[in-house]
Every structure is written in C-alpha cells, then in structure tokens.
Amino acid sequence: MRDAFTRALMREAEKDPRLTLVTGDLGFGVLKPFWETYPEQFVNAGIAEQAMTGLAAGLAMTGRTVLTYSIGNFPTLRCIEQIRNDCAYHDANVKVVCVGGGFVYGSLGMSHHATEDMAILRALPGVTVFTPGDPHEVEAIVPVMLRTPGTCYLRLGRGGEPCLHPGPIENYDAPRALTLREGTDVALLSAGGILTQTVAAADLLAQKGVSAEVVSFPCIKPIDREKLAELATRFRHIVTVEEHSIVGGFGGAVCETLAEMGAGCRIHRIGMEDVYSCIVGTQQYLREKYDMDAAAICERTLAWLAE
C-alpha cells in the first residue's frame, strides 16, 4: 500500500504545486522518489508529531493541501489534540496518513498497535475516514481524498499487500463500497488491510458450501448507506471485519447505520474485543491470536449461520 500511495501522490503533485507532504522523520525508503522529484513540496518535521500536525495546519491556512505521514499511532493518537483543535475545528485541508493500521507493527508492542484510531478519528466532526483494502483501492482513493474539503484520515497497511481487485478502480467516488465477490448466504463486510483475510475466509466458506458476498468499504465516514440498506434486504446475517477494536470502529458504524434504518438483519462484528493487545508478534500471528484471521472468520461465521 505504501508504494501505491507514493505513486498516486506523485501523480497529483505534478498537477498541483500546492500539494505538500510533511513526514515525521520516517518513510524515506518509500518517500524518496517524492522528495527527489518535488523537493519544494516536502518537509521533514522531525520526530515531533504534534509540531508536524500544527505545521500542517498552518501550511493549509496558506492555501496548500497538506499531508502528514507517520507510522502506527504516531500521526493520530500522539497528536489527537492538534488534529482536533488545529485541523478539524478549522476545516484545515490536512490529510493525516497512517502507515501501519492494526497489527502491521505487531512486533514492536502495544504502543505500535493501531487498534483504536478509526474510532477516535471517526468521532471528530467533519473528518472523513478512508480505509482502503488493497493497493488498487489506495490509488483510487488518494485523488478523491485530496479533492475532499477539510481534514481527512487515510489508514494504510505497510507494504507487500496483494491486489485483490482484478484491475485499477476507475472513477471511484467516496463513500462507495466495492463488491469483490457476490454471494447468497452471508455478507462479509471489510474495512482496511484485513480485506486479504476476508477474501480468504470467503474461499474457506465456499469449501463448506456457504456462498459469501465480500464487500470492501474504502471509506467508513461517511459510510455507504445505500449499500448497507441493500445488503440488509438481501442477507439475514452480516459480518463486519476490521483489524481494530469493535468499539466505535467500522463494525460500530455499520451497526449505528442499520439500527437507524430499522434493518431486520443480524450483525456480527469481528475485531478486537474491548481489551488492549498485550501480545507481541507478527501481524499474522496477532490476527490468529485475536480470532480475525481467515480461519477464524470462517469458523465464527459458520457458527453464527447455525444459530
């Protein structure tokens, strides 16, 4: 996802000299093509994320479109007050970019486990939250995000994620959800890089004779209400999957929306329970430990369908 982000950003920077990227002293292996090509549109704010965010807000007030870039919780939780007071409150044209949503940096411990970010950023008035599931979605979302007024949050994986869509996504318009696979028995809704596990779970369910529809939500605030309403009329069971706490995140957004609609379907949320991730390990290891890998998604879905 990181490489897809850089490619898309460079295409936009060529068209708009006001586009500015501010990094918190990292990401140089990925961002090097950007700063070498557009040195006047690149700032290294150092390991000072609060200052980075305040700087971005100030630059945005001069008419620039500014992106802040860091890993894990550092561009979000570490500077949430600056995002709230300096950026979102003023509708500043700042796009907060997190590389490493969920357990991407799992081996570095809970300080680097980004499992509350979507809920916190979703709660800020006026902030748009983007959660692409594969590199194709990233490249489709970046130009849309840059055209979206005000403060936005872009939650990325790290790198090496497979392309799950058959090809580039043309003419994406937020918050449109994207169907990867049609099904008849259950709907699996996914937000973010956990999409790889959701698609794999659908394959496992197919082996059990269960037809699962897979829908990716590259934008969760605002959320695609029309798609949710349509799914609620077709499926008795809807399963949400996120590498994030089930409290206030994607699953919460789906529940809130369908409850307001008076939908009669059952909603089941897969993600972190209301606990901290106290285990250290690789991303896949932690997905397995917290029952959000493909096998767990399959097993839990089968159990719900049997109820």
Label every PLM stretch briefly.
Residues 1-155, 157-307:
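Thiamine diphosphate
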